[in-house]
Amino acid sequence: GWQGQRLEPDFAALRTAGYQAWWEHMPLPKAMRPVAGRARIHQRLDWGRLARIQLLDARQYRDPQACPKPGRGGSNTVRRHDCPALADPARSMLGAEQERWLAEGWALDRTWNLLAQTTLMARCSLTDTAQGGTYWNDGWDGYAANRQRLLAGVAERRVPGAVVLSGDVHANYVADLKVDFDDPRAPVVASEFCGTSISSQGAPQAR
């Protein structure tokens, strides 16, 4: 599958080779063939008049993860109070062009609008949110403003049957998605279903 952490984004030649290997060994349509070291992953599919399925690319166009720890780049957990960049509105997980593409793609005449993407979209803190919370900077919590823009667009357009399909976090989640996760009275604008891994271990479940 498409997992950005399997590639090394700092080295263009390795990334190009990774895209080519992915293309050669996965059952993909011709339209997704890599060109000039780039691979167009995001696309939309219509299932008659019942559903529109939009597939996102949350790896190629993103800003770097916020607040990297010394000696360790990439994915980390960071405290919200210690990392103002988590809420920086200029940062994007999708990139400006893909954000616009998605905003224009909701099908108001379909019963269902399914958004398939790679990781948990719901807010998920490892510590008490009343104390600010601790978040994984590689997922949507690391790009909170982009998530808010996406969900605000769903709310403003009253997108029917909005469902987000996710994975990556090695656990099953079912979540209500809101524009403002800090407001317990905020309306639900979409539902999320996150599938678990087949064999990889997830986070501890003890309470």
Residue ranges and their predicted role:
Residues 1-207:
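Long, structured stretches of catalytic cores involved in phosphate-ester chemistry, encompassing
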